[in-house]
């Protein structure tokens, strides 16, 4: 048996004693949302790290990227923190996007910015009525826990909750986990990049 399967089996065995509601009950509620002040116009400049604001989801690009207009009318492109959803051209990519559209289209959300990515998108936790949307995508088999980033930056308690949610979805064969070994989006992107003529 490969070395990685033993810890995975232990985690799945431990999760057998966890109810889905136990994972959901560990969803954190964001601090009181505060409007971003002092920024002019409808700038698409990302909000500073640690910023909290409230806004309406105006579009869902894919299973981990949305556009939000905050309460002051400023537009934000937001990448959901610590998850990686299948790309649109990949198996389950459309399902992941459509799930996020169903739960977020035209919804008001609380945004907790953690970083800005290399594309200038805010990287953030999103909450809708107290529900951690990022975690919900993992829990429902619509995204992976993006551990290569999360293990360096995500708070340990959140990391453990997200890892447990992914293991549960995997054990239940939910969403993208219905397939035995689904191709992770970071590997899909690497394959696409390698296949492009130089």
Q: Where are the predicted features?
A:
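Small beta-barrel nucleic-acid-binding modules, primarily SNase/OB-fold domains
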Residues: 1-198
């Amino acid at each position: 048996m490969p070395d990685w399967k033993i810890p995975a089996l232990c985690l799945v065995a431990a999760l057998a004693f966890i109810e889905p509601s136990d994972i959901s009950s560990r969803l954190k509620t964001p601090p009181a949302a505060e409007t971003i002040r002092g920024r002019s116009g409808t700038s698409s400049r990302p909000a500073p790290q640690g910023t909290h604001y409230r806004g309406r989801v105006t579009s869902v690009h894919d299973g981990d990227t949305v556009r939000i207009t905050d309460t002051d009318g400023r537009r934000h492109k937001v990448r959901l923190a610590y998850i990686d959803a299948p790309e649109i051209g990949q198996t389950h990519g459309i399902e992941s996007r459509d799930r996020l559209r169903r739960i977020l289209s035209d919804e008001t959300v609380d945004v907790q910015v953690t970083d800005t990515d290399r594309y200038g998108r805010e990287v953030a936790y999103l909450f809708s009525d107290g529900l951690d949307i990022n975690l919900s995508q993992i829990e429902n088999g619509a995204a992976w826990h993006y551990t290569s980033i999360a293990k360096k930056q995500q708070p340990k308690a959140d990391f453990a909750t997200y890892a447990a949610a992914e293991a549960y979805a995997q054990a239940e064969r939910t969403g993208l986990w219905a397939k035995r070994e689904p191709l992770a989006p970071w590997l899909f992107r690497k394959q696409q990049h390698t296949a492009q003529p130089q």
